[in-house]
Amino acid sequence: MSQQNIPFTNNVQTADFSVQHSKSEKVNLMNMTRQEMREFLANLGEKPFRADQLMKWIYHFGEDEFDNMSNINKVLREKLKKVAEIKAPAIAIEQRSSDGTIKWAMQVGNQQIETVYIPEGDRATLCVSSQVGCALECKFCSTAQQGFNRNLTVSEIIGQVWRASKIIGNFGITGVRPITNVVMMGMGEPLLNMNNVIPAMQIMLDDFAYGLSKRRVTLSTAGVVPALDLMREKIDVALAISLHAPNNELRNEIMPINKKYNIKMLMDSVAKYLAVSNANHGKVTIEYVLLDHVNDGTEHAHQLAEVLKNTPCKINLIPWNPFPEAPYGKSSNSRVDRFQKTLMEYGFTVIVRKTRGDDIDAACGQLAGEVIDRTKRTLEKRKFGKSIMVNNH
């Protein structure tokens, strides 16, 4: 199947990045937590338990047609058909890797986001996107090269889980393992879309929806410190920090957000989150992508150990996954091994993440989708004749 590419956009400076709907449109029930659905149904004169029933139909049974909800009376079904709908992003393209990984390009308006299913052993992880593109400009990430368009809505986030669950189905029937974990590590910076990401994660945790343990839902952030400080008051899930550099000078270069929220500010915020979190077992996951002769030297490992000496953590080393026109190279196995061993000598738990789905550009850092960029950054690149790479997957 052929794929068209349209750019994504998410801008931190603009006031509103959400999708605008006309007042005449039906309400999408996937945009609601169970409490919000109860309030919606109360306005229709219905009792709270109807929200519980609807949530089960939508998320336990994958139902999106009111007429098929047999324990909801016909009067309410007819009422709902007039004012509400159940709508998740549609699958535009599916790609299956030789290692069992599946990547879906999902349609959101006239753009596409990417969602990745990663089975391994007795678990299967779904990597979910939070924005159409990304505004953070991390130099080693394919998504960042697409620019930014907008935040995803709650329904567009939880709808990725719903759509994937529908396709994966029951393990005993399809031979494909059901989703056991969800990671907010797809396209976008989740903490720049808190108003939609948090309700979506609440639905993931809700027993009337997916009922995932808070230890099986992970939010990964590049370090939007004020939002992380706020998140600890809103929800408790597993936390992963995209650190990728052991000092501010290098992190400023490869992750410009560090110029605003430096490493100390970020790690102080992490400590506050861990102090109140039950989901993290007292430890945060540190993600560190290895770039050949950029951040993978022995001196970098020693610096990283110093940065993390007071932070209970597990370190995930991520072999960098190439994308077109990227300015970096992949670290050799010997450099990866040396980096890992150096950190382990300090007593850290250090895992080298296995690359999955790289044959379909579904590996970490390779997600691109189709983004209509709205940032001045890519407009400037076009002005000065620099090519903007849009990947066709």
Swiss-Prot record:
Instruction: Enumerate the active-site residues.
Output: E114, C364
**Compartment(s):** Cytoplasm
For this chain, one GO molecular function annotation is: rRNA binding
* Domain Radical SAM core, residue spans: 120-359
EC category: transferase
Can you quote a single GO CC term? cytoplasm
Q: Summarize where [4Fe-4S] cluster binds, as residue positions.
A: C134, C138, C141
Task: Name the cystine pairs.
Answer: C127-C364
Tell me, which GO biological process terms does this entry list? rRNA base methylation; tRNA methylation
Query: Catalyzes what?
Result: adenosine(2503) in 23S rRNA + 2 reduced [2Fe-2S]-[ferredoxin] + 2 S-adenosyl-L-methionine = 2-methyladenosine(2503) in 23S rRNA + 5'-deoxyadenosine + L-methionine + 2 oxidized [2Fe-2S]-[ferredoxin] + S-adenosyl-L-homocysteine; adenosine(37) in tRNA + 2 reduced [2Fe-2S]-[ferredoxin] + 2 S-adenosyl-L-methionine = 2-methyladenosine(37) in tRNA + 5'-deoxyadenosine + L-methionine + 2 oxidized [2Fe-2S]-[ferredoxin] + S-adenosyl-L-homocysteine
Cross-referenced Pfam families:
Radical_SAM, RlmN_N
Give yes or no: UniProt keyword Methyltransferase: yes
Q: How is the cofactor bound?
A: Binds 1 [4Fe-4S] cluster. The cluster is coordinated with 3 cysteines and an exchangeable S-adenosyl-L-methionine.
Primary residence: cytoplasm
Keyword check for Amino-acid biosynthesis, yes or no.
Answer: no
Q: Which residues bind S-adenosyl-L-methionine?
A: G188, E189, S220, S242, L243, H244, N321
Q: Which cofactor does it need?
A: [4Fe-4S] cluster
Keyword vocabulary terms for this entry: 4Fe-4S, Cytoplasm, Disulfide bond, Iron, Iron-sulfur, Metal-binding, Methyltransferase, rRNA processing, S-adenosyl-L-methionine, Transferase, tRNA processing
Q: What EC number(s) would the UniProt record show? A: 2.1.1.192
Extra remark beyond the main annotation: Reaction proceeds by a ping-pong mechanism involving intermediate methylation of a conserved cysteine residue.
Q: Which NCBIfam families match?
A: PRK11194.1, rRNA_mod_RlmN
- What is the role of the protein in this entry? Specifically methylates position 2 of adenine 2503 in 23S rRNA and position 2 of adenine 37 in tRNAs. m2A2503 modification seems to play a crucial role in the proofreading step occurring at the peptidyl transferase center and thus would serve to optimize ribosomal fidelity.
Q: Which family does it belong to?
A: Belongs to the radical SAM superfamily. RlmN family.
Q: What is this protein called?
A: Dual-specificity RNA methyltransferase RlmN
The source organism is: Haemophilus ducreyi (strain 35000HP / ATCC 700724)
What lineage does UniProt assign to this protein's organism?
Bacteria, Pseudomonadati, Pseudomonadota, Gammaproteobacteria, Pasteurellales
Query: Gene for this protein?
Result: rlmN
